Amino acid sequence: MQTYGSRNVDYGWWAGNSRFADRTGLWLAAHVAQASFIVLWAGAITLFEVARYTPSIPMGEQGLILIPHLAALGIGVGAGGVVVNTFPYTAIGAVHLISSFVFAFGAIFHVRFGPESIGEGSDSKFAFSWDDPKQLGLILGHHLLLLGLGAIFFVGWIRFHGVYDSTIGDVRIVSNPGATILSVIFEYGWFTPEHNPFFVNNLEDLASGHAFIGVVLLSGGVWHITQEPFAWAQRLLASLFSAEGLLSSALAGLSMLGFAAAYFSAVNTLAYPIEFFGPPLELQFNIMPYFVDSVDLPAGVYSARAWLCNVHFYLAFFVLQGHLWHAIRAIGFDFKKVSNAFATLSN
């Protein structure tokens, strides 16, 4: 994991997956276990929100963060954004809980019965080392395929089931979800006037955007699975071909997505309808920037939009610090030299 000095470092429990950097079988088990916790959280919080949901109070003022997303997907809601059936929310929460147990079993299985390194198993296709660009590209490609399938699934959902359209106040389908894809590429893609992607205001463009991104991700997945990184790319991105380098790049991506999600959820009322998330937010500054509700709410009450936006913003900020830390270490800088330098000055 460490890219400078001694590479044989014994990490404590607090170091997370760093302990398994050279034991890819346990690395896989750790990822499956983390997926279990994420899905467990999603299921448990969904059921918790169903239990406390009050139809007489606007959804956006109840401190809910998961049910509003389900409602925006057109699940359990009717005209005017009125929740007509909460059973789908309960069912979705229960499915997530059950799925988390399946993931947990998979993690335990890989710890107890799986090989310590993936290459020792019956299927060594995904065996890798941190300095092997070809295998790392193969794994990246499969990640991109899964992301692309997720985007295409949303296109299918909006085509056959429909989502809530805040411009008409009802659930509707988009019969031709790729009809405006040229607008997405040449207008939203270049932030032309009245085509800021953060302010997309119709479902046709939202669907076409997902279709375009889905195709890009799937194409990228196929490319990285079949094509080893070019020599110039390996030289340019040499610091990435290490455990710490890949961690830093992953954190950079998470940070970028977090900032984008924070601003998008703060200002967009199509993907985040006012009926479910509350009105758009206002940006204010103190020690750090933060977003506040633009309407008066009871003391101690914040809209779902405020919760989502600010949590994404601050998580993205701290993840960015993690990226910088690990990126600097990945290029070989030893932070211990800083403390040693201060110690020398004090003496």
UniProtKB/Swiss-Prot annotation:
GO biological process, one term: photosynthetic electron transport chain
Cofactor note: Chlorophyll a.
Presence of keyword Transmembrane helix: yes
GO cellular component: photosystem I; photosystem II; plasma membrane-derived thylakoid membrane
Transmembrane spans: 25-45, 64-84, 91-111, 206-226, 247-267, 308-328
Cofactor section: chlorophyll a; chlorophyll b
UniProt-listed InterPro entries: PS_antenna-like, PS_II_antenna-like_sf
Organism superkingdom: Bacteria
Subcellular location field: Cellular thylakoid membrane
Pfam families referenced in this protein's UniProt entry, alphabetically: PSII
SUPFAM superfamilies assigned to the protein according to its UniProt record, in alphabetical order: Photosystem II antenna protein-like (SSF161077)
GO molecular function: chlorophyll binding
Record keywords: Chlorophyll, Chromophore, Membrane, Photosynthesis, Photosystem I, Photosystem II, Thylakoid, Transmembrane, Transmembrane helix
Topology in the lipid bilayer: Multi-pass membrane protein
Record function comment: The antenna complex functions as a light receptor, it captures and delivers excitation energy to photosystems II and I. The Prochlorales pcb genes are not related to higher plant LHCs.
Family as reported in the entry's similarity comment: Belongs to the PsbB/PsbC family. IsiA/Pcb subfamily.
Subunit structure: The antenna complex consists of chlorophylls (a and b) and chlorophyll a/b binding proteins.
Name of the protein described by the UniProt record: Chlorophyll a/b light-harvesting protein PcbB
Annotated source species: Prochlorothrix hollandica
Origin organism lineage: Bacteria, Bacillati, Cyanobacteriota, Cyanophyceae, Prochlorotrichales
